[in-house]
Each structure stands twice: as C-alpha cells, then as structure tokens.
Design a protein with these regions (language model features):
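Hydrophobic/aromatic-enriched cytosolic interaction surfaces used to assemble or bind macromolecules
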Residues: 1-193
Length: 193
C-alpha cells in the first residue's frame, strides 16, 4: 500500500559520529522530527533510509494508528498487507535508475502537495513537503524557491507528476507520462506498480 505525503512526515537526519546503536539513531531521528515539527512523534513509526557512514538520511514518519488500522482492515477482509510505504519512497526507488548521479532535485507532485528531495555531492541535503497549487507556475515557483533557500544553483530537476492531465511545461526531466484517465490515485498506483 502506498501512502500519500498527506499521511507522512519527512525529515533530514544529519550524520552524527556520536551515534553507535540503532536505538540511539531512532531517538536522534525523533529529536530531528520534534525540532522540525515542534511536537514529539511518540505515536508515529519512523523509518530511515539506508545511507553510508557520514551521510545524512531521509527519515519518514507514519502514524502508528493508521498502520494498525490498515492491518486490521486487511485482516477483516482476509487480505495480507505485505507493505505500507510512502508514495515518495516508492516513486523515488522506481525512478532512481533514470536519475544521473551528482546534484539533483527530485520532485514528486501529488495533487495539492509536492515533496522535494535535494541531493548534492552524492548526499541528501534536504527533504521538503509543501502544499502547492496544481499549476505549472506554482510548481516552478516552489522549485526555484527551494533552490534559493538552500543556496543551490538550479540543479537538474526530475519531476514525477503522474496525476497531471497534461505534461507539465517545466524545465525538468519528466519521469512518467500522464495517465490517460483523470484519477490521480489510480495514476499514482500505475506509476509505481
């Protein structure tokens, strides 16, 4: 099952030489989320991207109550829920072979919400989830603002926008073609299936 960014929280977890145990890493990631969102995520499940020593990680938090409810619905329906993951990670993993190494901005444009992953020098620099109008102008402004905030020249931009009815007219590499029907959820499913 893929979850929209509406149900997920994302955070960059910087490398720390002081961490030597998985429990310490989990506590550190929770502290990073609390610092970013201003509240503890005690009832959220946190998963970190596997990165080499010295590199920042992307952390994803999913509400534990939502995960438990999905498990219960699966049992009630006699279905086996094998995987629950943020759509961002599924889309990035599916598209990663198309991305050139080095500096880039990966943009997942969901309906009314976009998530941006900024990489430089082969390491994650930022992850940002932002409400965004469903227009090319709003998306282009978000991309430019993100690059300005982090002092980066406009890197190569990869756009994954499967719910759009038309190909966005942006200076970006399109990672999937728009769906033939207007259901963005169905389009997202097809894009990462």
């Amino acid at each position: 099952m893929l979850l929209s960014a509406r149900y997920s929280r994302f955070c960059l977890v910087p490398w720390s030489d002081a961490i030597s145990h998985p429990r310490e890493l989990d506590a550190y990631a929770r502290a990073c989320f609390e610092n970013l969102y201003g509240q503890p995520l005690d009832d959220w499940r946190i998963v970190l991207s596997p990165e080499p020593a010295g590199a920042a990680r992307i952390a994803t938090a999913l509400p534990e109550a939502l995960l438990q409810r999905l498990q219960a619905l699966g049992r009630e329906s006699r279905l086996s829920l094998r995987s629950v993951q943020p759509y961002l990670m599924a889309a990035y993993n599916r598209c990663s072979a198309q991305l050139e190494q080095g500096d880039f901005l990966f943009v997942l444009a969901e309906p009314r919400r976009s998530v941006l992953l900024l990489a430089a020098g082969g390491a994650w620099q930022q992850v940002l989830a932002q409400g965004c109008a469903d227009s090319d102008q709003a998306l282009q402004a978000l991309i430019e603002r993100t690059c300005e905030l982090y002092g980066e020249h406009l890197p190569r931009v990869y756009l994954h926008a499967p719910g759009r009815g038309e190909v966005p007219q942006l200076a970006a590499v399109q990672l999937c073609q728009p769906a033939s029907d207007a259901d963005p959820l169905c389009a997202m499913w097809r894009a990462v299936a």
